[in-house]
Amino acid sequence: MKTKHILMATALASLSLMTTSCGSDFLDKAPSGNYTAPTFYSSDKAVMKGVEPLYNKAWFNFNRRALIGMGSFRANDGWNPYVSAEFANFKVTALTEDLSLAWSALYNVVTMSNATLANLEQYCTNDVTPSVKNAAEGECYLMRGWAYFYLLRGWGDNILFEDNNKLVQNPNQPLNTEADVLKFIIRDFRKAEQLLPETGTDHHASKYAAKAALAKALLAQSGWEEGSTTDHQRNEATLQEVKNLCDEVINSGQYSLMNNYEDLFKAQNNDNSETVLAMRWADPNSGEWGAMNATYSDLAFPEVTDVNVWGGNLSPSCDMLDYYNEDPADSIRRNATWFTPNTYYSYIKKSDGGYTY
């Protein structure tokens, strides 16, 4: 019995020490080694860095594999019997992993955009230049709009939300109609256009990236909106706005077509005159998983890279090759987009003098 009393007394003593140690001063410790929202947004540089995950990590599980399957494979440009084959074979179901990863990634972009907008509004100090804050907010609206644009075209009706906290408190939200989702997208792109600068810096978007996105969304709306079209005719007023926006982008002086189509795919032209808006990924050899571009794994094959890849079974579709072969001059595009037998590529394995497939 004495032993039990001693053990109980020791336990109670320990509990009292634990209880008295947990005062408010003990709990209110500033994290060491990590940034926190209340103190992070204190300079122009920090604000610009704060939106950069919207150019990579937020999109990772959409860009990694689903984008190719939902895009090129479903469009019958090509296919791989071992990777995302169900998109080419029209066997996609609600349980298809790439599809669910894409859906969650796109909503990740939405929630990250919402959180960044809230942080910018709440925590930006007076040391942040108003134009820099506006640009960062514009990027959030632009990325959220693009995420919803992909969600709309992939899933139709979707859940719209701008406040993450409200969604957490009440996660049971109704679906919004396609027409309403498209209106939301267009509203976001218009806000982005108003807030973004004339010229982007350090790979950040300019207002012309928003104008281009807005033109694309309005083009969709011109034939989508109920009551505005009859007999499959598009809304002419909307089409005129699309034309005006495209003219503004083209005549901005910031973009131009490259002379050689093949040059688009060369590493040294990663940022070129045709780039309006692009994701920004870390080096696949040294970058953090989730912040680097992992599409190379599915698209490349071991013979042409020192990175771990498995794209050797990727092939163009017969229809794709037929389109290229209709015009012999189109071998320029064919050779640039697909490795063609007996074709020499001077920009592949340059240290070895090039590569012949």
Predicted segment positions?
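Bacterial Sec-dependent N-terminal signal peptides
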Residues: 1-32
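Secondary-structure transition into beta-strands, especially the periplasmic turns and strand N-termini
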Residues: 5, 18-21, 124-141, 240-248
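An aromatic- and glycine-enriched ligand-binding surface/loop that stacks and positions planar moieties
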Residues: 22-84, 190-191, 204-357
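Flexible, solvent-exposed coil segments and beta strand-coil junctions
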Residues: 32, 92-93, 165-167
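Conserved, well-structured interaction surfaces
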Residues: 41-63, 79-155, 170-183, 187-202
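A short secondary-structure junction motif
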Residues: 120-123, 154-161, 192, 221, ...
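Short coil/linker segments at helix-helix boundaries
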Residues: 157-179, 224-243
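Glycine- and aromatic-rich loop/turn segments at beta-sheet edges
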Residues: 159-164, 195-203, 256-262
